[in-house]
């Protein structure tokens, strides 16, 4: 069984994590490293995917500045999303040819990993036809956003953002994923209290490894 090297990065700026992803993706492409996973939390950040439209940021620049929110144009797929402390972000750096070579199947695997984590807490996670991510309450509220990129050499970057206990008011600054008629929720809201972030991270690692047939090892640094 192949290994998955896991980096627990704590709180890290979006651009710093993005640069780390690019560096690791080059190393994965050349075979210097195996499949790798970054787990982290971002400070308040709005990111724009390759399908995002400016009008999906509804806050003014002054409002964003007052809340300390930065805006980053990303190279991931998808539209606009919001990151904040209390949100578990996972960036898999995978060689896709070892996992079926199908981006759609890979994204479904990411969704399934979150659905299994939610099930462990007694929450029913669901997919919504035509949309990406994981939803609850019959698709009424999104609990996990997904946006990925596949390089020319077939290596994945970016990934998923699972709302554990972020300040959900930050999502009022945007139209999340360009979808205006559905809400946003978190594990804390659904459970009535927030589970420990480290516990959720461990369960996500186990779920990803089960789905993609990997064995986790912690990075030395």
Swiss-Prot record:
InterPro entries: aa-tRNA-synth_II/BPL/LPL (IPR045864), BPL_LPL_catalytic (IPR004143), Octanoyltransferase (IPR000544), Octanoyltransferase_CS (IPR020605). Residues 31-216 form the BPL/LPL catalytic domain. It is an enzyme of class 2 (transferase). GO terms for molecular function: lipoyl(octanoyl) transferase activity. Its main location: cytoplasm. Keywords: Acyltransferase, Cytoplasm, Transferase. Pfam families: LplA-B_cat. SUPFAM superfamilies: Class II aaRS and biotin synthetases (SSF55681). The keyword Transferase applies. The record marks 142 as: Lowers pKa of active site Cys. The active site is at residue 177. It catalyses: octanoyl-[ACP] + L-lysyl-[protein] = N(6)-octanoyl-L-lysyl-[protein] + holo-[ACP] + H(+). GO terms for cellular component: cytoplasm. GO terms for biological process: protein modification process. It is found in: Cytoplasm. Pathway: Protein modification; protein lipoylation via endogenous pathway; protein N(6)-(lipoyl)lysine from octanoyl-[acyl-carrier-protein]: step 1/2. Its EC number is 2.3.1.181. NCBIfam families: lipB, PRK14345.1. Belongs to the LipB family. This is Octanoyltransferase. It comes from Chloroflexus aggregans (strain MD-66 / DSM 9485). The gene is lipB.
């Amino acid at each position: 069984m192949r290994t998955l090297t896991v980096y627990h990065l704590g709180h890290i700026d979006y651009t710093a994590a993005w640069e780390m992803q690019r560096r690791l993706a080059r190393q994965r492409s050349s075979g210097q490293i195996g499949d790798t996973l970054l787990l982290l939390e971002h400070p308040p950040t709005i990111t724009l995917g390759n399908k995002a439209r400016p009008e999906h940021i509804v806050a003014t620049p002054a409002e964003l500045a007052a809340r300390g929110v930065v805006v980053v144009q990303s190279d991931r797929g998808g539209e606009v999303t919001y990151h904040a402390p209390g949100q578990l972000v996972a960036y898999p750096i995978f060689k896709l040819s070892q996992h079926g070579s199908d981006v759609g199947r890979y994204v479904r695997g990411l969704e399934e990993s979150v659905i299994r984590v939610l099930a462990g807490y007694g929450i029913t996670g669901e997919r919504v036809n035509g949309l990406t991510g994981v939803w609850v309450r019959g698709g009424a509220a999104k609990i996990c956003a997904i946006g990925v990129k596949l390089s020319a050499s077939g290596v994945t970057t970016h990934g998923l953002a699972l709302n554990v206990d972020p300040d959900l008011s930050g999502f009022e600054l945007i139209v999340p994923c360009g979808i205006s008629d559905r809400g946003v929720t978190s594990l804390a809201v659904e459970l009535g209290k927030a589970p420990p972030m480290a516990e959720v991270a461990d369960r996500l690692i186990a779920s990803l490894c089960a789905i993609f047939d990997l064995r986790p090892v912690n990075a030395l640094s």
